[in-house]
Amino acid sequence: MKTLSWRVSEVDESAVALLASRTGLRPLTARILLSRGHGAPEQITRFFAPRLGELRPPTGMADIERALDRLIRAIHDRETIGVFGDYDVDGVTSAAVLTVAMRALGATVVPRVASRADGYGLTVAMVDALAGQSCRVIVTGDCGTSDFAALGRARERGIDVVVIDHHQVPTGPRMAYALINPHQSEDAFPFKGLASCGIAFYLMAALRSRLGIASFDPREMLDLVALGTIADLVPLLDENRILVAAGLRVLTARRRPGLRALIEVAQLTDEAIAADQVGFRLTPRLNAAGRLGDAQLALDLLLAPDDLQARALAGQLDEV
């Protein structure tokens, strides 16, 4: 068995003492925070008590305005919008965020997720299937950046594809109608660690703002964003930390039938849902659908309209 050696970061002990005295933290906690680059009291406040009001606006996200213009046109012209997510939890929750929001904002949406048997990402066959359901726009979640064959097929069929993704951007032609990916060179948003569900949340919040529909509150979707962000193991810093902290509060309220049923089958009885419970009890069940069964089951659960349907789907999911 390989022996691992720990490398402990060296920290100025006088800085540890000063930070502990200024914040009331224990010296060990102050040392850990300093080793992670959190030295100012205001940084520590944001770390321990992140607030939604501290989310930076999507200014600088490449192609977000182009994506918004196309989605608004689709809603106004009553075009059918296809939503397609990858089969992991980030992809499924991205698809759920997009579907919930756009339906609430007046769109006709056909939601689909990838099948592991068909491989990762948007496929030519899926483009054809969504075209067969009269989709004129496709919005992807957690895939699409490098799916050149499928993007080419969509272009041939006159379908505009809005890609929401956070995977690395390969060299090659940009074939999507709009690409919202923090790793493209044109993107100027300061935080590059968002999961796709977080990017989807930003896009939908901006869409609601542009349409001026006050009856829909994007914050209601933060339970989904917390699930996808935690499951994808992205750094819980900056925007991710804010979204997850707020999302755990929404999840604890248990307002979504599908997640209420999932919490029941996971036998979580604590009043408050914590990040470790999401990571070890909830998201593995959702992931199992995509890895061992059909990820559409997980998406259907998240979109379930009532407790009766949600409990039936959660029971099926728990047996996968």
Where are these predicted regions, by residue range?
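Residue-level marker for buried hydrophobic side chains located in beta-strands
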Residues: 83, 139, 162-163, 229
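Phosphate/diphosphate-binding loops
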Residues: 137, 141-160
